[in-house]
Amino acid sequence: MLMTTTTIAMSLSHDVIIAAAQRAARAIPPLWPLASSVAVNPFLGQASEPLEVAAARLRRASGIAVTMPRSWYAERLQSGEITEDDLQAAFQTAPAARRPPNVSALKHAIKVARPAPQAIPTVAELARDVTAIDWPGIVNERIGHWAAGYFDQGQALWAVGQSGGAYSTWRIIATHDLTPEIAGLAGFSQSVSDAPATAEDALVDCVARLGLSPDALDGYFHRLLTTLGGWGQVARYRLWQAELNGGTDACVTDLLAIRMLWEAALLHNGGSALVPGWQSAIAAYAAPVAASSDDVVDSILQEAAERAAQRKLNTVLAAPSSARLSRGRLTLQMAFCIDVRSEVFRRALESLDSGITTLGFAGFFGFGIGHRRFASDVVEARLPVLLSPGVVTCAGEPTPAANAAELSARITARAKRAWGRFKLAAISSFAFVEATGPIYIAKLLRDGLALARHHAPTDPAPRPAHELDLDTRLTMAARILKAMSFTSNFARLVVLAGHGAKVVNNPHASALHCGACGGYSGEVNARLLASLLNDHQVRAGLAERGIVIPADTLFLAALHDTTTDAVTLFADDHPSPTHAQDLAQVTQWLAAAGALARGERALRLPRANRSQDIAHRARDWAEIRPEWALAGCQAFIAAPRSRSAGRDLAGRAFLHDYDWRCDHGFGVLELILTAPVVVASWISLQYYGSTVAPERFGAGNKLLHNVTGGIGVVEGNGGILRTGLPWQSVHDGERLIHEPLRLSVLIEAPTEAIGAILERHPQLRALFDNRWLHLFALDDEGRMARRYIGDLSWETYVGDASSQSNRASTLA
């Protein structure tokens, strides 16, 4: 017996259904391909609602919890890490109508395990329960098999054509795929053949066949997209990129239509046995999303854990600083990315000499570029993913010698690609190992024993593909220096350090690079800025604008390898014999700082008994934790460096230099809040999601990963595309390395200025109002003075009341 199409479903208009599909598309996050992967907030579609409501929504859509098990909070309460005051303060922030009657009741609730989260069932899941056939697994396997070819970015030798869109391409393949019918879904190929020709019409048809009510559409569509795992997010990425360039993309709608055709066919095939369960599911999808009392309890516990961490952070910032700063002219100023990994190296470097100071700025250094590497036609977007490239750059000067070198490199690259395809081809691959295996013995031994050596980037110095006029260069230089709060007191040597990570056998290698550079290493942007600021015409123009750079100041670019803490200086870009002694001294300092940083990081890395083990890990094919990347991140501080210098923040804080007294009109503050803070929130929440819900927001086990399509990874031989971070990125095998805490943003600026910016940017304000981020204003001494409580309101922050003598000096 088939489900009778209801009058309500038949009356649903095309526009109503498509609008619901578009809303569902925005409820899931995008997924960037592996070559340029960046951290993405998995809760991007839920930023407009608080944690407890998002928990209710994602439980229905994905069957997950978005906070840690209650035992995790109970342990912290018992150890004293979470205090009674933290619990009481968190309790007061919860809506009075839904929280427990008092803190005693809350403490009792901690001892009671919350119910296991259950998603509202799909037709495939109901059919599995009735027939004992794993229909959800079959659906995921068949869609994944097709999607791996359709979305392929060069890995497959025989790529699936993309003309006509995802829906049309899938129909062509599905009408010839007998797997569903062999599994028991009779007539599936014919039903696909008979389906409407367009995805939108197919959606409308399936809504009627499934008997969906208007109120059920959003929840059901969201549920289906989550069952697709990373494939839905790849389609969402396409929509993101299209909208960034002023267009649109229908791939998410196509995938939703594909998934709904499976649902409609399964309902038709299941007959009356599925009707009662499906009617109950429709009613559940149509019910309003509302937080349960358990959701509110979990939200309060999460808030309490974060308040405990904030109290500890305030103690560190309020403690006396051990920093020593020269009263004369500085010898070295070194600008780093705000990435938390830089904090360890910066602290180590500054400890070596009072003539050294460091700065923090977004790692793309204000250059929003699309860069074409040497001997490549691929334009890499080396800037935050929230932005579009404004300048196209390339490597090397257009000289005859450079052109000849590029041609030679292109020929070599083509030969390597041809050889690689020959190795993987359907016929030649069988004989390849037997015929050429001995040739690879030396390489296999070298790589297998981690004897290979990493080499610094060798691309020629980058330049704009089309020469920029002086006024444009001047405007760029002034804007960047002001954004860095770096307009005076220049040292003889200023080093601009981008960062990257050199690892082997790691599909997620780009995730270890600079997020502000779009998942690429940051040396290109740093080299461009150094060239710009060494330009004599630019310096003369800057002086007329009040930014005087001494004639003996030299800007150099560098690359900080976050895996080994080695630093490469690009001194040959701007040779200066008069700075030879300075460079020799700086080289020694960088080597010493690297040793200190490696020693500190070795304490956290498993099986890294000595700092010398760090470099070996970067070359080891079998190493699943070459570095901890941004695990542990919990704070973003925008203030003068003096507020954090000499204080051990344990590699857990993003540090952005900012002096509001020099920011007339607060344009720089607005830029910080709308760009670096948002990028940092994406990073923080990706780590949070991969920790609290690894089954949905994590990439699974690295040991089982197979790269598919050059896009992402699957576990084993197929199925859904995994997203987020591998479990080994947040867990050391015995305990969690990343504490799942929402980011605390600390800004030294007047609250009136911060509030005005939040009022102008509703999406940014929603992150703070719904406490996906915490916001604090620092006073003139760098202490946490005011807490943002939502609705453009602030309260006085009362931190640790203990005496200065009892204060800790580290955040670890």
UniProtKB/Swiss-Prot annotation:
Cell compartment(s), UniProt: Cell inner membrane
Which Pfam family is an annotated match for this chain, by its short name?
DabA
Asked whether the UniProt record includes Transport among its keywords, one would answer yes
| Alphabetical list of InterPro entries matching this protein | DabA (IPR018752)
Tell me its cofactors.
Zn(2+)
Q: What does the UniProt keyword field contain?
A: Cell inner membrane, Cell membrane, Membrane, Metal-binding, Transport, Zinc
Give a GO cellular-component term.
Answer: plasma membrane
* Lipid biosynthesis keyword on record: no
Q: How the protein sits in the membrane?
A: Peripheral membrane protein
Lineage: superkingdom: Bacteria
GO molecular function ontology, one term from the record: zinc ion binding
- Ranges in coiled-coil conformation: none
Q: How does it assemble?
A: Forms a complex with DabB.
The protein's job, in short, is: Part of an energy-coupled inorganic carbon pump.
Family membership, please give it.
Belongs to the inorganic carbon transporter (TC 9.A.2) DabA family.
Q: What is this protein called?
A: Probable inorganic carbon transporter subunit DabA
Which organism's genome codes for this protein? Answer: Xanthomonas oryzae pv. oryzae (strain PXO99A)
